[in-house]
């Protein structure tokens, strides 16, 4: 929100300079991003009138002018501007003036003709571009001799206020002024009288509000018989420009001016272009509308529109249609001033690639009781400038759907609890009265009702924030911390998340943080069987679904980096995923990662290879090795929609799936925007947050026996199944089983494979006997045969 300081000071005028005003606004939560002067420094430039213009005797492109600058005698100025004519009002830098760039005006002779000053264009004074090739033309009623800085209010400053979404009430000069008045405890004064414009004409335009939830209030009236040549006054154009908008024509400028002044967006239709009744309704699927920016839209059924008998004429609260726009030939106007519910506007502008000042305000919320005042103000300005006859008001109001402020209880002890300081009851009441709240004292504190424009007030904490803002956070005394200071401790069996993250960083991963909201279509493709939540008011359509997995965010990060020539990527993220079962929302902490590209960074040896499934499995096993379930988690082949059917596995713990990993399905590579073979994993954090308690154990001093066994098994049998079978052998001397070969080929049937294992056998307290070792080997062979039908090769 760009705020003209001089305009603001017409409403409220604290005894603060510009910098102090900006600082106080920032401390009160209206953060000031910057302060810009409306014009650079220059001196001795006045309003002048060109009396006569004659051609220069020795220069075809120069003119000799006589100029009235408000002195006793006119001055002669040689001028090269193409648009200089007798009778015009212009900006004149007198002798002694200093223009931007330290350009000093002196008496001079141009081609032998004396020149005592300089007639200036807008660019020479550092003023906004007026689109004129030549002199900056001033209004005919500009008083000759007046200092230009005073006449155009060029000592004004534009304060850029960055508002948070909940402070939509400050998207106007009046809104910011209300806060300044409360903060500074100074009077708030409206600089214009509340005038009710005479409405003696008959309104032939009927209005039918079909969707009363989306539009609980619609006001309008016709204006005709006005001066169609009337132009926007320079003071109004100036204020509109300083707010960051461009003047268009009188009608549009007045609606924009009222929006900037009071915060109520408005729209004006060419009444002669409207056919039949105005209807406020939802769009019919695939209806067309050409907007004012000449963009044809195909409307969706969830879009609120203003329509006539021929179809839509405006996107409600967003932008008007070209088919009903006001032009230089318009003789009858229909002014619309409505209240649109935020839920009916949120996201609709972005849905069509639009963002307007109107949608910006309606999305955040506008005072439901402001349209009456705003319409009267617009009609007052219009009739004062252009005259005309105003019809009676057309009003369609559904009181039940209007936001009604509710009383909120405020307790003194809660103020102390949240702000850390006790504020006198009288001061609390004074603060809320300055904020225009209705204050009622009761046994437990106060019942406070916010004014209609403060629809962000919902709970007690909101009220306490207001107390802190207006009292001044910088006025809160410093207090010592009251809580006992002690370092948090974890049981020895629990490990902190940062250790898990550090383990991945040590393996070459980079940590990322992605949004919890993802594209609905992509999520459905990746996890079609998992119920998910959708946001009612998403930031954008591609951030509508709450993630059920970390994979969409990880893949978007990979896509972003691959487009920037980063081909070797190893990333991980820890966070919540959201699912919905039996009408209940579940939030599960998980950790996930992704790898793609070469295994190692480029190095001088030139030896490298692409990552594969087993590289990722090694990363996952590193995390499992930190936990107490390292030996209990099993990797079992399975199929997920997101993974390649032959390159995926589930992590199974006690019969439950606690994680999954695999290669991204080739059919999803394009829609995910990535290239190459991407490998992903995700597991529940709870699985690895409990670790083994370290226990010292002496190393056996006695010889270790190693025996190699090769088993022939079914070719489809996972190796883990064979290892699990051997694990069922009850023995204290079997220390480890390691795979050293898997073979398929000559001597083995096509439907089988050979798995070669090394068994490490050792007793803790004595040397083993051959009989003990042989007995163990027999048990291993027997278990392998019983459980997986393995034959000793």
Curated annotation (Swiss-Prot):
This is Phenylalanine--tRNA ligase beta subunit. GO terms for biological process: phenylalanyl-tRNA aminoacylation. Mg(2+) binds at residues 456, 462, 465-466. NCBIfam families: pheT_bact, YtpR. The lineage of its organism: Bacteria, Pseudomonadati, Pseudomonadota, Gammaproteobacteria, Thiotrichales. Its cofactor is Mg(2+). Residues 700-793 form the FDX-ACB domain. Belongs to the phenylalanyl-tRNA synthetase beta subunit family. Type 1 subfamily. It catalyses: tRNA(Phe) + L-phenylalanine + ATP = L-phenylalanyl-tRNA(Phe) + AMP + diphosphate + H(+). Keywords: Aminoacyl-tRNA synthetase, ATP-binding, Cytoplasm, Ligase, Magnesium, Metal-binding, Nucleotide-binding, Protein biosynthesis, RNA-binding, tRNA-binding. It comes from Hydrogenovibrio crunogenus (strain DSM 25203 / XCL-2) (Thiomicrospira crunogena). One of its GO terms (cellular component) is phenylalanine-tRNA ligase complex. Binds 2 magnesium ions per tetramer. Its EC number is 6.1.1.20. GO terms for molecular function: ATP binding; magnesium ion binding; phenylalanine-tRNA ligase activity; tRNA binding. Residues 39-149 form the tRNA-binding domain. It comes from the Bacteria.
């Amino acid at each position: 929100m760009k705020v003209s300081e001089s305009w603001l000071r017409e409403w409220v005028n604290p005894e603060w300079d510009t910098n102090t005003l900006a600082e106080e606004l920032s401390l009160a939560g209206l953060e000031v991003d910057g302060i810009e002067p409306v014009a650079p420094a220059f001196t001795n430039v006045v309003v002048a009138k060109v009396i006569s213009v004659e051609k220069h005797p020795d220069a075809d492109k120069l003119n000799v002018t006589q100029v009235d600058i408000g002195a006793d005698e006119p001055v002669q100025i040689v001028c090269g501007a193409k648009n200089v004519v007798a009778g015009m009002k212009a900006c004149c830098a007198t002798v002694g003036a200093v223009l931007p760039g330290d350009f000093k005006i002196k008496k001079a002779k141009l081609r032998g003709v004396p020149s005592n000053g300089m007639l200036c264009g807008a660019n020479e004074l550092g003023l906004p571009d007026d689109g004129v090739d030549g002199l900056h033309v001033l209004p005919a009623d500009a008083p000759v001799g007046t200092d230009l800085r005073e006449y155009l209010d060029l000592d004004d400053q534009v304060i850029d206020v960055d508002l948070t979404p909940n402070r939509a009430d400050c998207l106007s000069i009046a809104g910011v002024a209300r806060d300044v008045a409360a903060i500074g405890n100074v009077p708030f004064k409206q600089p214009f009288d509340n005038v009710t414009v005479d409405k003696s004409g008959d309104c032939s335009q009927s209005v039918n509000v079909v969707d009363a939830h989306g539009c609980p209030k619609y006001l309008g009236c016709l204006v005709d018989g006005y001066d169609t040549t009337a132009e926007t006054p320079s003071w109004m154009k100036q204020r509109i420009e300083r707010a960051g908008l461009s003047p268009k024509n009188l009608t549009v400028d007045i609606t924009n001016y009222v929006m900037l002044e009071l915060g109520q967006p408005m729209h004006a239709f060419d009444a002669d272009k409207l056919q039949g009744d105005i209807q406020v309704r939802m769009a019919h699927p695939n209806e067309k509308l050409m907007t004012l920016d000449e963009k044809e839209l195909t409307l969706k059924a969830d879009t609120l529109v203003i329509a006539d008998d021929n179809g839509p004429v405006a996107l409600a609260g967003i932008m008007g249609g070209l088919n009903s726009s006001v032009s230089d030939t318009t003789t009858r106007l229909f002014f619309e001033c409505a209240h649109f519910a935020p839920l009916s506007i949120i996201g609709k502008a972005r849905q069509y690639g639009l963002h307007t000042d109107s949608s910006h305000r309606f999305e955040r919320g506008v005072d439901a009781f402001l349209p009456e005042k705003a319409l009267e103000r617009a009609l007052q300005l219009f009739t004062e400038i252009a005259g005309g006859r105003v019809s009676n008001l057309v009003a369609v109001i559904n009181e039940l759907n209007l936001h009604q402020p509710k009383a909120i209880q405020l307790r003194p002890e809660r103020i102390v609890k949240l702000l850390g300081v006790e504020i006198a009851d009288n001061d609390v009441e004074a603060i809320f009265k300055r904020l225009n709240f209705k204050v009622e004292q009761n046994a437990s504190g106060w019942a406070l009702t916010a004014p209609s424009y403060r629809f962000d007030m919902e709970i007690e904490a909101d009220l306490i924030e207001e107390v802190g803002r207006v009292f001044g956070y910088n006025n809160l005394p410093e207090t010592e911390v009251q809580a006992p200071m002690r370092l948090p401790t974890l049981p020895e069996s629990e490990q902190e998340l940062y250790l898990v993250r550090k383990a991945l960083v040590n393996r070459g991963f980079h940590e990322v943080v992605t949004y919890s909201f993802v594209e609905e279509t992509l999520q459905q493709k990746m996890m079609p069987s998992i119920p998910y939540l959708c946001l009612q008011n998403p930031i954008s359509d591609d951030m509508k679904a709450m993630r059920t997995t970390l994979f969409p965010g990880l893949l978007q990060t990979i896509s972003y980096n691959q487009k920037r020539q980063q081909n070797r990527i190893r990333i991980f993220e820890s966070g919540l995923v959201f699912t919905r079962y039996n009408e209940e929302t579940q939030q599960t902490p998980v950790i996930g990662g992704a790898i793609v590209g070469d295994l190692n960074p480029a190095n001088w040896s030139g030896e490298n290879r692409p990552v594969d499934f087993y590289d990722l499995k090694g990363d996952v096993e590193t995390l499992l090795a930190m936990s107490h379930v390292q030996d209990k988690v099993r990797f079992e082949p399975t199929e997920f929609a997101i993974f390649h059917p032959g390159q995926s596995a589930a992590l199974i713990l006690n019969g439950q799936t606690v994680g999954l990993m695999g290669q991204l399905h080739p059919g999803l590579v394009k829609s995910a925007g990535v290239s190459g073979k991407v490998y992903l994993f995700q597991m529940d954090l709870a699985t690895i947050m409990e670790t083994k308690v370290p226990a010292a154990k002496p190393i056996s001093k006695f010889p270790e026996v190693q025996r190699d066994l090769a088993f022939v098994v079914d070719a489809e049998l996972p190796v883990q199944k064979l290892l699990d079978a051997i694990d069922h052998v009850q023995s204290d001397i079997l220390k480890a089983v390691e795979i050293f070969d898997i073979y398929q080929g000559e001597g083995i049937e096509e439907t089988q494979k050979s798995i070669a294992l090394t068994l490490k056998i050792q007793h803790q307290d004595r040397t083993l006997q051959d009989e003990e070792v042989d007995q163990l080997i027999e048990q291993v062979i027997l278990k392998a045969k019983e459980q997986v039908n393995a034959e000793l090769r």
